[in-house]
Amino acid sequence: MLLVDDQSLVRAGFRMVIDSQPDLVVVGEAADGLDGVRQAAALRPDVVVMDVRMPVLDGIEATRRVTALDPPPKVVVLTTFDLDENALAAIRAGASAFLLKDARPEEMLAALRTVHAGDAVIAPSTTRRLLDHLAPARDPRAERAVATLTEREREVLVAMSRGWSNGEIAERFVVAEGTIKTHVGHILAKLEARDRVQAVVIAYEAALVRPGDPTTS
């Protein structure tokens, strides 16, 4: 993990919690976005925890540059309040999720592990709530991309937007989990989405998923 935040106390708190876990380690810290990009390129962390508001280079542009690395790390953006438009901008720039700075330690660790796993669920529940309240405007490009999906792929994408894991989707459709993984791979490829969160953003932009849609059915 790489911690990028201009507040040293925030970094120290996150480091203490993360380093207490046997499967997680903080490999570096940065106090501004530009240094965060440099360290991400040098250290190649699996996950970057990125503040949105920072000097020199803000977290949105830093996220865009970090996720352009090859291979790109996952990015979790930090925000001080739940429905932050900057958090949505960071997700559109490439972040996989966002996390409140005052999240409980167990929530933070669960979010980091979820994002690191990549294909577990779309992101912490706060991310879906953000998309519901600050739903991206309809985008004809997104509509055209979603139109290339098969009916089953659209059904899987809707299930992904509800935060379901591959196993939960497989159980719902009574198919093997490997079949769902194949569908997800096709969806990401057709939508040119980097990960599940980006695919879900496109689903909102195409109005395949709308704010207030149920998370279960």
Tell where the protein language model's regions lie, with residue ranges.
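Basic, Lys/Arg-enriched C-terminal extension of HTH/homeodomain DNA-binding domains
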Residues: 188-217
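Short amphipathic alpha-helix used as the core "switch/output" element in two-component signaling
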Residues: 38, 60-72
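Active-site residues of response regulator receiver
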Residues: 5, 51, 79
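Recognition helix of helix-turn-helix DNA-binding domains
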Residues: 163-198
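Short, flexible helix-to-coil linker/hinge segments that flank and couple to helix-turn-helix
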Residues: 85-92, 96-97, 102-151, 155, ...
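Acidic catalytic/metal-coordinating carboxylates
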Residues: 32-35, 56-61
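Active-site beta3 strand of CheY-like receiver
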Residues: 43-49
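The feature encodes the CheY-like receiver
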Residues: 10, 55, 83
